[in-house]
A protein has these predicted regions:
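A short, solvent-exposed beta-edge/loop patch
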Residues: 119-155
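Bacterial signal peptide processing site
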Residues: 21-24
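Short, compositionally biased low-complexity segments enriched in polar/charged residues
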Residues: 49-79, 93, 97
Length: 155
């Protein structure tokens, strides 16, 4: 009987310690690697790289000191909706606000595309927008499902 009780106590302690353990892993991906993986997996037209100082021109009300790291590529021609934005913020409390900026940008592009390039609308209606800790990401590509898979694994 004592062995049974001792075994049960060990089992209960094991369950309690498993319940208290944290399964949330904090990832710290290199954004250059993430954008490289996306570019390797998905076909893009000619893309232009955007610098942090130019973010306000693209609807992101951020100062360079707000951004710890960034990768931003957009269609060089402006005729397609292809765009990938990866931002690591210095202050993660701003992440939801920056996500909203990405959604507003997507909606603005969609409004224009609806009239001029309606075939680009699917990229925008299925675009990936998300936040994970201090990271914000937005992707409108030819394969948003693949972009989402890569981004989910990265963050």
């Amino acid at each position: 009987m004592r062995k049974f009780l001792a075994g049960m106590m060990c089992f209960v302690l094991l369950l309690a310690s498993a319940a208290c353990s944290s399964n949330t892993e904090t990832k710290n991906p290199n954004l250059s690697d993430v954008i490289g993986e996306i570019r390797a997996a998905i076909e893009f037209p000619e893309m232009a790289e955007i610098k942090v100082a130019d973010l306000p021109m693209y609807g992101y009300d951020l100062k360079p000191e707000d951004v710890a790291e960034m990768q931003f590529i957009t269609a060089g021609s402006g005729f397609t909706a292809d765009e990938v934005v990866l931002i690591k913020l210095n202050d993660k409390s701003k992440a939801e606000e920056v996500k909203k900026m990405a959604e507003i940008r997507r909606d603005g592009i969609a409004e224009t595309a609806q009239n001029y390039t309606p075939d680009e609308m699917e990229k925008l209606t299925t675009a990936v927008v998300g936040v994970k800790d201090s990271y914000v990401y937005y992707a409108a590509t030819n394969d948003n499902a693949k972009a989402k898979e890569i981004l989910t694994n990265a963050f």
